Curated annotation (Swiss-Prot):
The lineage of its organism: Bacteria, Pseudomonadati, Pseudomonadota, Gammaproteobacteria, Alteromonadales. Keywords: Cytoplasm, Elongation factor, GTP-binding, Nucleotide-binding, Protein biosynthesis. This is Elongation factor G 2. Residues 5-280 form the tr-type G domain. PROSITE patterns: G_TR_1 (PS00301), G_TR_2 (PS51722). GO terms for cellular component: cytoplasm. The gene is fusA2. GO terms for molecular function: GTP binding; GTPase activity; guanosine tetraphosphate binding; translation elongation factor activity. GTP binds at residues 14-21, 78-82, 132-135.
């Protein structure tokens, strides 16, 4: 077993095409995990092992790989860069202790880089910055360093300087050692020499080295005082201070190179060892009660404590069902019985494996700090806590975003429904941001996801992996409804048909609630006109109706219901009577409260070459977009805008046409906003037409 202090659980984060997966490939090559390097553009990379990943040259799932460097164990997770798969980044951050943010030397801080960086900040994950592709045309290391300050509000700590640039890039100067690492053009990582700093770089190296040491010694008051008196700290003290500043997110050690040409990778791996934290150096995960509220206890990273582990990913592949697990406390052995605290059921651990992309090595045991996969777990889902049955506990839950887009699907073959249902069930277990439901009116199967590409990939997986050919409908937007006026009203439910009857009368107010509060129930009833025992029934009845609004049948958001008075009958009143009364109150009063249709607004981040900025902005305006910000860079302009999702279908094709293939964009859900009347009327008409067509079938 590796010592806990020598574990590094890290993720590789970047924008699409920044070289993230290639960087991972080079790490595996250098650590001896692979002998032939696979290239993303050839569809051969080790961590992009899905057919869809290989064909599209993007990472879709987070692939976990274990390897070793300088006696340290690395568990490396290569995460997706496309915004539609951000859920993979989110759940990876939940179980990582550190990360490497990869930025393109010419593209700089691109849209999805910013999103992933923000998520990592929220999770307080320590990071190293690696500026990749310095052999590319237009690459500029110091410009990208400045962008990380300006765009990400990061504090990059420059650790190396490049020697040469673009096609003349040949190596880097290590500022700490004042030594140049120069590679030949063979593309082999081991073919490098360590030399003195080139004469024309000496002054620049000394300038940046001084800034580096000043930033480092600020982490230690005694060292800072000595340094101010002219005493240079030892290499050991400098590294200790850099490690401290990295762990506290005070700064981010910044390196550069070319992963594709194997230049600069060894220094990056050394930095992971030297500066990123071990599992027991990060804040422990909080434990919660059954309601998800923190209870003041923590999952201390210690192999000698009772088992506490988090299932953070489910994957069904050619080997069977895999449950990826991060062990925070304790040990886990083959044959152990563990408790799933979410279901309350125990399960025996069969085979355990270390993952090597889509390959695996069977292991007998694992301990705190490990990221492993368990084969054949039956009742475990993403976010479930696995623990010692004698010491039950619950780790903080994983929360996933709500889908914003949906499509209706049906199997082409009449007998394919069961096959489709089984396949979709497996896919939902793997991806919590992918949902399915059945339309109550039409009986259609509705797939819901985070974007067009997300659902496109799911349909492709159903076809290729599970052999289910589908008829796919047009993408549908997840509209919502709300109210804009307060209504004071009364509703009586009375039923008498021999024997005991039903009676429940409620007086109430409904009003617009605060944004993102959903349904809020209050009671200001004084006295016993509506006994307290019936209040939950009123809440349940009204709340159950919030799934179907009165405008077009979309779910209703942000409504506050206040029960003010009412009446009951000693014999005929019951919980069911008051629940029915509350449902009637919804139908009666929502329509009076000036209901309004809401549409999802997306936060859109577009990169446009200078020549096409006017066209891009004009197109966003035509899509009802609101331009929020523009930032000019060396290679083009970043445009940020809020745009309705309904206007963004097919946008990538339009952008590529306008920019001759050079434009890029990302988008993520921002908020719901009121639809203009013209849009609302159009949506209502479409819903009516769809229901009429379904009724004729």
């Amino acid at each position: 077993m590796t010592e806990l202090s020598k574990y590094r659980n890290i993720g590789i984060f970047a924008h699409v095409d920044a070289g993230k997966t290639t960087t991972t490939e080079r790490i595996l090559k250098l650590t001896g995990k692979i002998h032939k390097i696979g290239e993303v553009h050839d569809g051969e990379s080790t961590t992009d092992f899905m057919v869809q990943e290989a064909e599209r040259g993007i990472t879709i799932q987070s692939a976990a790989v274990s390897c070793f460097w300088n006696d340290h164990r690395f568990n490396v997770i290569d995460t997706p860069g496309h915004v539609d798969f951000t859920v993979e980044v989110y759940r990876s951050l939940k179980v990582l202790d550190g990360g490497v943010g990869v930025f393109c030397g010419s593209g700089g801080v691109e849209p999805q880089s910013e999103t992933n960086w923000r998520y990592a900040n929220d999770s307080e994950v320590a990071r190293i910055i690696f500026v990749n592709k310095l052999d590319r045309m237009g690459a500029d290391f110091l410009r990208v360093v400045k962008q990380t300050k300006d765009v990400l509000a990061a504090n990059p700590l420059v650790m190396v300087l490049p020697i040469g640039i673009e096609d003349e890039f040949c190596g880097v100067v290590d500022l700490l050692t004042r030594k140049a690492h120069i590679w030949d053009d063979s593309g082999l990582p081991e073919n490098f020499e360590i030399k003195d700093v080139p004469a024309d770089m000496v002054d620049l190296v000394e300038e940046y080295r001084e800034m580096l040491i000043e930033a480092a010694v600020e982490q230690d008051d005694d060292l800072l005082e000595s340094y101010m008196e002219g005493v240079e700290p030892s290499m050991e003290d400098i590294k200790r201070c850099i490690r401290k500043g990295t762990r506290t997110l005070t700064f981010f050690p910044t390196y550069c190179g070319s992963a594709f040409k194997n230049k600069g990778m060894q220094l990056l791996l050394d930095a992971v060892v030297d500066y990123l934290p071990a599992p027991d150096e990060v804040d422990p995960q909080p434990l919660t009660d059954e309601e998800g509220v923190e209870n003041g206890e923590f999952a201390i990273v210690d192999a000698d404590l009772p088992l506490k582990a988090l299932a953070f990913k489910i994957m069904d592949d050619r080997f069977g069902a895999l449950t990826f697990v991060r062990i925070y406390s304790g040990r886990l052995k083959k044959g152990d019985t563990i408790l799933n605290s979410f279901t309350g059921k125990s399960e025996r651990v069969g085979r355990m494996v270390e993952m090597y992309a889509d390959d695996r090595i069977e292991i007998e045991s694992a301990q705190a700090g490990d990221i492993i996969a368990i084969v054949g777990m039956k009742n475990v889902q993403t976010g479930h806590t696995l623990c010692d049955p004698k010491h039950p506990c619950t780790l903080e839950a994983m929360v996933f975003p709500e889908p914003v887009i949906s499509i209706a699907v049906a199997p082409k073959d009449k007998g394919g429904s069961e096959k489709m249902g089984i396949a979709i069930g497996k896919m939902i277990a793997e991806d919590p941001s992918f949902r399915v439901e059945t339309d109550e009116d039409s009986g259609e199967t509705i797939l819901k996801g985070m974007g067009e590409l997300h659902l496109d990939i799911k349909v492709d997986i159903l076809k290729r992996t599970y052999g289910v050919e589908l008829i796919v409908g047009e993408p549908q937007v997840a509209y919502r409804e709300t109210i804009t006026a307060e209504v004071e009203d009364s509703y009586t439910h009375k039923k008498q048909s021999g024997g005991s009857g039903q009676f429940g009368k409620i007086d109430y107010k409904i009003r617009p609630g605060e944004a993102n509060t959903g349904f809020v129930f209050k009671s200001s009833v004084v006295g016993g006109n509506v006994p307290k025992e019936f209040w939950p029934a009123v809440q349940k009845g009204f709340g159950s109706m919030m799934n179907t609004g009165t405008i077009a049948g979309f779910p209703v958001l942000d409504v506050e219901f206040e029960l003010t008075d009412g009446a009951f009958h000693a014999v005929d009143s019951s919980a069911i009577a008051f629940e029915i009364a509350a449902k009637g109150a919804f139908r009666q009063s929502i329509a009076k409260a000036k209901p309004q249709l809401l549409e999802p607004i997306m936060k859109v981040d577009v990169f446009s070459p200078d020549d096409n900025v006017g066209d891009v902005i004009g197109d966003l305006n035509r899509r009802r977009g609101m331009i929020k910000d523009q930032n000019a860079g060396v290679t083009g302009v970043r445009i940020k805008a809020d745009v309705p999702l309904s206007e963004m279908f097919g946008y990538i094709g339009t952008l590529r046409t306008m920019t001759s293939g050079r434009g890029q964009f990302s988008m993520e859900f921002a908020h719901y906003a009121a639809c203009p009347n013209s849009v609302s009327e159009k949506v209502v008409t479409q819903v009516k037409e769809r229901k009429a067509a379904e009724a004729k079938k």
